[in-house]
Amino acid sequence: MDVDNGEGQVQVHLKTKQEHYAVPDVPYAIDGTVTTAELNTFVNALLLSKGSSAVDFDFLVFDEYLRGRLCDHLREKAISFEDAIEIEYVERFPAPEPQDCLLHDDWVSAVKASGKWILTGCYDNTLNIWTNKGKHILTIPGHTAPIKAVDWISLDDDTGRFVSSSQDQTAMLWQWNVGANTVECVSVCKGHERGVDSVSVSPDGQRFATGSWDTMLKVWSAELEDAGEGTSKRMKESGVRTPKITLQGHRESISAVQWMDASTLLTGSWDHTLKVWDLSLEGIKAEISTNKSIFDASYSKLNHLILTASADKNLRLYDSRTNQGSVVRNTYLGHNAWVQTVMWSTTEEFLFVSGSYDNQNKLWDCRSPKAPLYDLLGHGEKVLDIDWSNPKYIVSGGSDNTVRVFKSRKALVENMDTK
């Protein structure tokens, strides 16, 4: 078999974890030059004999999506052609559909969705609350400089609580009366000496963490009443809140912060490092060195992997569990400018989204490093933040003064079920 020239046949086994799409587990002889299109035709022909309708599939060969000819994929992986090759096929994830464009008065630098609400933060110093159907509910003044990050603390039918951080060197705790549609600033959190670029609420909603241009990581109480011993009566009465913990270790701005669990924090920084912090010990548990400034980072509780967004147009994947944390597991190519923001899906183990200064959002599968699954178009200028906290909606904000809302598979399936 002249495999180097892409000729001849390859013995393959076709496998799927979706049992209703399973085909007979026997060796199939296929041409080495086949692509995803031909494999789709082949598998669908086998399924058609069972009475199934046509389905679009993607194909995984040695844990990576097939994006060209099978022979080229195997040659790149240095895989022998002598033995039967296992090919896994999965139903193709549907393309997210544009749903809404939410117009703001200035750059939208922070977005976070929860339930039927979307919280946004802008460069005009205001917060905004919207429904995920595109209705504007409230504009909230309070900060004195552009807002850089937001996160929900808790949300039910009657009350919403959230936190915002800003270039004005503060974070603010807010309480929203949903029925009356009124918002109160519960506390102004002071302690940083420069702008606060990142904020994240703990899984139990009792604390939140902030990362700043002053290189400090700070942890604060998210409770309505801060009963800490270090809080003076004067500060309580003025609504000022001070940090419970201050952690030093980064050399430049902390651009990303996320809770990995109840006592562990992940931070990413312009100093080219990721750090994992143990709050029970109040110190660094692990460090991952990279070769680029990190603009954003995202940790997945489903697969324990970390993604980073950087200035060199690429996204990178690291394993939080390995002792060789500086080794890049994968690099994802597709953006044409700085990648500003990245986030794992909270429900789909392999999927994540990114936003870039090339004006594009992209939906990825971490097993497809050479190309995204889909480009999510709509922004006319730089994408500044992206969020997939609500599994139904991918939400992004940009310097075109808009928030773009895309319906993901969960919302699309629900829409089909109600028709």
From Swiss-Prot:
Residues in WD repeats: 103-141, 142-184, 191-230, 249-287, 289-328, 334-374, 378-416
One Gene Ontology CC term in the entry: nucleoplasm
SMART domains the UniProt entry points to: WD40
One GO-annotated biological process of the protein: maturation of LSU-rRNA from tricistronic rRNA transcript (SSU-rRNA, 5.8S rRNA, LSU-rRNA)
Alphabetized UniProt keyword annotations: Nucleus, Repeat, Ribosome biogenesis, rRNA processing, WD repeat
Region called Ubiquitin-like (UBL) domain, residue ranges: 10-91
Record-linked Gene3D superfamilies: YVTN repeat-like/Quinoprotein amine dehydrogenase
Keyword flag Iron-sulfur: no
GO MF annotation list: ribonucleoprotein complex binding
Cited function: Required for maturation of ribosomal RNAs and formation of the large ribosomal subunit.
Name of this protein: Ribosome biogenesis protein WDR12 homolog
Organism this protein belongs to: Drosophila pseudoobscura pseudoobscura
